[in-house]
Design a protein with these regions (language model features):
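Long, contiguous regulatory modules within eukaryotic nuclear regulatory proteins
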Residues: 31-96, 415-416
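Fold-level signature of zinc-dependent metallopeptidase catalytic domains
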Residues: 2-12, 16-56, 129-289, 302-309, ...
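Disulfide-rich extracellular modules in secreted proteins and receptors
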Residues: 21, 26-27, 80, 92-98, ...
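Catalytic-domain carbohydrate-binding cleft regions of carbohydrate-active enzymes
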Residues: 316
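Short, hydrophobic/proline-enriched secondary-structure or compact coil segments at domain edges
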Residues: 103-111, 255-264, 429
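Autoinhibitory propeptides
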Residues: 70-145
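Conserved phosphoacceptor histidine of two-component systems
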Residues: 313
Length: 475
């Protein structure tokens, strides 16, 4: 039984930073203790109060296939996460490194804004390092290590699900190094875990234990006319039905509680050579910890973090959660009291971009609670003892330029830009429009994107308000 998420949600929150392409010189103002709050000044309207976060296991496994052989590399999750910080109020998440008398910052400033250091040639010597703030956009509708001690031990109050992420070669190629890929995924899962803070009795959280790069011949691809950009003859798509079945065959009995395959290829159903690309993810309903079914697949457009809302949605399906308004999983139906409409726009709505799609409905929370209660002790036990932590210190949307976001989400559309921002910002949406002969695409804002006048409000979990940056709070 498949649970299909048919629309993408871009889950970065944007911080109110002035102009795309703005050059800034971040500096550390204050540090209160080794792992306590750090104050990072970027510019007058962007001051981050950063704390450490935990997502990665202590002995993190990175796997790839070399000449047909699988090679496992043990990475120090503690070292990867050593530079990861977050600001919960600002919905920002960044990597922070001291370098030659200055500070180097990479990551998310909010829903749409990103920050990255300029090329080293732009620097004259020691001291402040020049950085660029840029914006990203979304697609249309239709890190250190932390030991698992008392904090990461499943009990009556918290259920930790161990997660493996398998990335295809196309997704891996978007990053300069294996560590950069791991840090990107760790930060994404930190923001997924924040969404799962809605859950209770138990609270559900995910531990990222392994990242693997799939073999080149692993994917199920097909060619079809480009349904989004008629000016192009053909495009490569990935068949989600064939892909999830292959993922289940290879990873359905992995040691981890759940495996998620991530691709940067457009997922699309194949109807006699015609692509229908409204599918953004797929999962085996109730598959978590099951035999042969503990898998899901999602689509992502790095470095926009567009997978966050999708993977949060698909992981809920593996935890036995149906779409709002649909019949619940039969095995837990007798444990449920709530019934919810499919039109409330929550995270598990049949379609995305609803007004509440950064949050679970009461029905989803109840279904998750009922499903977890059916799991055996082996599943509820944390087996690997270590996990990966996110180093980022602020929400990705804070430094993500809206037009850049549009360009990454719709790379084949000429002169695509973010338009009608005064209207769409308070809705925590981005309208991406190219030349007039093409349609516009409505995309969800990324966590941290600014959404009000004066940059006091940011989008977080698809709501515009004066949010406290969740990355500021230790996990």
């Amino acid at each position: 039984m498949f649970a299909v998420f048919r629309c993408t949600f871009f889950s970065w929150l944007l911080l109110g930073v002035g102009v795309c392409g703005n050059v800034v010189y971040p500096r550390l103002l204050e540090a209160r203790g080794l792992d306590a709050e750090k104050v990072l000044y970027i510019q007058d309207d962007v001051v981050l109060r950063l704390q450490k976060t935990s997502v990665l296991s202590e002995s993190f496994v990175f796997s790839e296939n070399i000449n047909g052989r699988r090679v496992d590399k043990i990475m120090n999750g503690k070292e990867i996460e050593a530079d990861m910080y977050y600001d919960r109020n600002r919905m920002a998440s960044v990597n922070l490194k001291a370098k030659n008398g200055g500070v180097e910052v990479k990551g998310i400033l909010g829903h749409r804004l990103r920050i990255a250091p300029l090329d080293i040639s732009a620097r004259t010597g020691d001291g402040p390092i020049p950085h660029e703030i840029f914006q990203v956009e979304q697609r249309a509708v239709i890190p250190g290590n932390h030991s698992v001690g008392q904090e990461a031990k499943s009990d009556d109050n918290i259920f930790y699900a161990e997660l493996k992420i398998v990335a295809d070669g196309n997704h891996r190629d978007a990053f300069k190094s294996d560590q950069e890929l791991v840090e990107y995924l760790a930060l994404s899962m930190k923001l997924v875990n924040i969404r799962y803070e809605d859950t209770s009795n138990p609270r559900v959280q995910f531990l990222l234990t392994t990242v693997e790069v799939a073999e080149n011949n692993f994917t199920e691809l097909f060619y079809a006319p480009d349904v989004d950009c008629p000016g192009r003859a053909v495009k490569i798509y990935m068949d989600p039905v064939l892909m999830i079945n292959k993922t289940a065959k290879i990873y359905g009995n992995s040691d981890e509680d759940i495996t998620v395959f991530v691709t940067s290829v457009d997922l699309a159903d194949n109807f006699d050579g015609t692509a229908y690309n409204h599918v953004m993810g797929q999962a085996k309903l109730g598959g978590l910890c099951s035999k042969g079914r503990r898998v899901a697949i999602v689509e992502d457009v790095p470095p926009t973090y567009s997978l966050i809302q999708i993977i949060a949605h698909e992981l809920a399906h593996t935890l036995g959660v149906s779409h709002d308004g649909d019949e619940p999983l039969q095995s837990i139906a007798q444990k449920l009291n709530s019934r919810c409409t499919g039109f409330s726009g929550h995270l598990m709505a049949p379609s995305a971009h609803g007004k509440n799609n950064g949050h679970f409905s009461n029905c989803s929370i109840e279904q998750m609670r009922a499903f977890v209660s059916t799991l055996n002790e082996s599943c509820r036990e944390v087996k690997l003892k270590t996990y990966h932590k996110a180093r980022a210190q602020e929400l990705p949307g804070k430094i993500l330029n809206r037009t850049y976001y549009c360009q990454k989400k719709h790379p084949n559309y000429p002169r695509i830009t973010s338009e009608h921002e005064d209207y769409y910002k308070p809705l925590c949406k981005v309208l991406c429009c190219a030349d007039s002969i093409y349609p516009c695409f409505e995309e969800p804002a990324v966590d941290g994107m600014p959404c009000g006048h004066g940059h006091e409000k940011i989008c977080f979990r698809h709501r515009c308000d004066k949010h406290v940056d969740p990355l500021k709070r230790s996990q």
